[in-house]
Amino acid sequence: MKLTNYDIIRRPLITEKTMASMADKKYTFVVDIHANKSQIKNAIETIFDVKVEDVKTARIMGKTKRVGVHIGKRPDYKKAIVKLTEDSKTIEFFEGL
């Protein structure tokens, strides 16, 4: 199954730590678990019309949760930290947060 650019980028990851890193033009996204760095770079450049300098990825394992005697697990996900070039514009989606 071929992933489109909009299938690769799931959602932005907004935390205090990621908001602080936006000053250095580093943006964090939850991405498809099967996407590689070159696909993520291409998707970000196409969707947001920016230039990407570096992509770092991490696979996060879901936590085990329990409700009474029932045990479940949150899904695993992959996050990508995307650094933009110095002459690139900022991503407008994140402005005003």
UniProtKB/Swiss-Prot annotation:
Keywords: Ribonucleoprotein, Ribosomal protein, RNA-binding, rRNA-binding
GO molecular function, one term: rRNA binding
Gene3D superfamilies found in the cross-reference section: 3.30.70.330
GO biological process, one term: translation
A Gene Ontology cellular-component term: ribosome
Domain of life: Bacteria
Annotated InterPro entries: Nucleotide-bd_a/b_plait_sf, Ribosomal_uL23-like, Ribosomal_uL23/eL15/eS24_sf, Ribosomal_uL23_CS
Assembly and binders: Part of the 50S ribosomal subunit. Contacts protein L29, and trigger factor when it is bound to the ribosome.
Family from the record: Belongs to the universal ribosomal protein uL23 family.
Primary role: One of the early assembly proteins it binds 23S rRNA. One of the proteins that surrounds the polypeptide exit tunnel on the outside of the ribosome. Forms the main docking site for trigger factor binding to the ribosome.
Name under which the protein is recorded: Large ribosomal subunit protein uL23
Organism from which the protein derives: Clostridium botulinum (strain ATCC 19397 / Type A)
